[in-house]
Amino acid sequence: MHPSEMQRKAPPRRRRHRNRAPLTHKMNKMVTSEQMKLPSTKKAEPPTWAQLKKLTQLATKYLENTKVTQTPESMLLAALMIVSMVVSLPMPAGAAAANYTNWAYVPFPPLIRAVTWMDNPIEVYVNDSVWVHGPIDDRCPAKPEEEGMMINISIGYHYPPICLGRAPGCLMPAVQNWLVEVPTVSPISRFTYNMVSGMSLRPRVNYLQDFSYQRSLKFRPKGKPCPKEIPKESKNTEVLVWEECVANSVVILQNNEFGTIIDWAPRGQFYHNCSGQTQSCPSAQVSPAVDSDLTESLDKHKHKKLQSFYPWEWGEKGISTPRPKIISPVSGPEHPELWRLTVASHHIRIWSGNQTLETRDRKPFYTVDLNSSLTVPLQSCVKPPYMLVVGNIVIKPDSQTITCENCRLLTCIDSTFNWQHRILLVRAREGVWIPVSMDRPWEASPSIHILTEVLKGVLNRSKRFIFTLIAVIMGLIAVTAMAAVAGVALHSFVQSVNFVNDWQKNSTRLWNSQSSIDQKLANQINDLRQTVIWMGDRLMSLEHRFQLQCDWNTSDFCITPQIYNESEHHWDMVRRHLQGREDNLTLDISKLKEQIFEASKAHLNLVPGTEAIAGVADGLANLNPVTWVKTIGSTTIINLILILVCLFCLLLVCRCTQQLRRDSDHRERAMMTMVVLSKRKGGNVGKSKRDQIVTVSV
């Protein structure tokens, strides 16, 4: 057949099978059945919020690395790819039965602790800075619907806690007066006064009975001494000018088994000036009855009159707020913010009056007459992470615990407060150390976990190393690359880890919701100051996280490589730590932190996955065929036979290669001859037989 005819001939058509059924008919015959479940099949827990958040971050990172536009469709596909990769990993046999317990650091758990006298002063905001000294904020409470939530507490303490109210271990309330002098306009008046009365802290005695004078001076703060004259009223008669000063004598607010608390602020009161008097002069100070109802002197008594044959003097002059501090058993900082909570528990009363001089029985007679027709309601508030626990608070110094049943959680105190209750200052815990259990060993990298699990299943099989090794190498490239993106598994069957995750997640959402700052007033110094306090706690938590090496399957808290040793830290010690009782556990927790930091540092110094890679390398060594040859060829004769067999195979391959080359040359020559013949006009007509033979043989 001529070559041109071969090119023009169409290829044969396929024979159509007449008995082939339509696809729709076959689809109708398909039956879908439920996936078979083994007795060991477990129901997967739904993904947590932290896992979904981590999945979104991983999908975003994967799209950025692949330079794919971030659309909802691409995000969904990337997330599904990560999920399919993670859930397809083989689960080793017996993993569910294994139990690994490690120490975990949980930042900002849903726990509170008492604010102690050793803590720094907290920020207490007032709604009226005209009459009360301090930062102002009239937007509190931030969430009125959450004020007064009921709570039962049982927490521990190491240093004495700060408590206000009529109970052992709490500072007692009392009424305090501040006096200023105004210009006198009446000819019979010696002095004209304006006085402010409000709730304050009750002094036990006016001096430390069991302290010498030299020892009391040891705790005298550095500051401006109080003036020797009564402060003059400012130009603005509606503003009370507060000026911090240090009085000449100290008062003791508490001196018992809970500690000794003193105050160097002035305590102004009227007393008789007996200087230059020849007759007996009562020098006792005139003060309200502290055992009576505290609110009675501020509500019912709107007129005060003091009369005497001796001049009235105002002792401890100065307009300064109380600043209590603890000096025994430890020495702590001053806490001026406590007075702002106390003074807001009832309205303050504004007085005006004068001191007149008359003559009775030919003797000078002095009268102080004060009247009041103005009261000012106040409100004081704290902001998260601080709160106020109000109720029947009981402090037990023997066990160092604080209990309160059916108490209320508040952030603000106003004039409706009932002093039959007590106030305990609390704050959110920065972090706790607890042991958690897992169903696998602690691992720092997800890629090492995936590599170990895949190769563990391969190495447990027989020595089908040729094709298996190729498949494993091809798979490891994709698995390792994807594991760097996945970062964390989406499902975990460890109940304790899930419990801690939910426990900490809810508290984080709670504190974050309470700590939100109004963006419209973010430039105010008070918000900035509170934000700095909150960010300081966050930085402390981040500092711990940077120093720790955490397990790869947790994101909201950190599971450390330190294994929990029950004999060294029994559960009762952990429980006391959760309650905040740090009596005998403080040194243990400090030692535990050092051990955990050392373990994390050791893991950071090593290449991630060094132990796993070493184990995999030992397993892959068994797949080396040279080791098989060594086990088979233990004698020289067998090794020689193997070499001869290899040489024979090599010779056979060479001969086959040469034969294939000859056949290829013959085919090329034949094709060249056919091409020459097809191009000649007239073919072989007119040529001799010899020429034809020569032409064909070319």
UniProtKB/Swiss-Prot annotation:
GO terms for cellular component: plasma membrane. Specific enzymatic cleavages in vivo yield the mature SU and TM proteins. Residues 465-485 are annotated as: Fusion peptide. CDD domains: HIV-1-like_HR1-HR2. It comes from the Eukaryota. Residues 1-25 are annotated as: Disordered. InterPro entries: GP41-like, HERV-K_env, Retroviral_env_glycoprotein. Residues 1-88 form the signal peptide. Residues 89-631 are extracellular. The record marks 464-465 as: Cleavage. Keywords: Cell membrane, Cleavage on pair of basic residues, Disulfide bond, ERV, Glycoprotein, Membrane, Signal, Transmembrane, Transmembrane helix, Transposable element, Viral envelope protein, Virion. Residues 10-20 have a biased composition (Basic residues). GO terms for molecular function: structural molecule activity. Glycans are attached at residues 99, 127, 152, 273, 354, 371, 460, 506, 553, 565, 584. The chain crosses the membrane at residues 632-652. Residues 653-698 are cytoplasmic. Belongs to the beta type-B retroviral envelope protein family. HERV class-II K(HML-2) env subfamily. The surface (SU) and transmembrane (TM) proteins form a heterodimer. SU and TM are attached by noncovalent interactions or by a labile interchain disulfide bond. Retroviral envelope proteins mediate receptor recognition and membrane fusion during early infection. Endogenous envelope proteins may have kept, lost or modified their original function during evolution. This endogenous envelope protein has lost its original fusogenic properties. ERVK-21 has a type 2 genome. The HERV-K(HML-2) family contains type 1 and type 2 genomes depending on the absence or presence of 292 nucleotides at the 5'-end of the env gene resulting in Env proteins of distinct sizes. Despite their overall retroviral envelope structure HERV-K(HML-2) type 1 envelope proteins lack a predictable signal sequence. Subgenomic RNA transcripts coding for full-length envelope proteins have been detected for both type of genomes. This is Endogenous retrovirus group K member 21 Env polyprotein. It comes from Homo sapiens (Human).
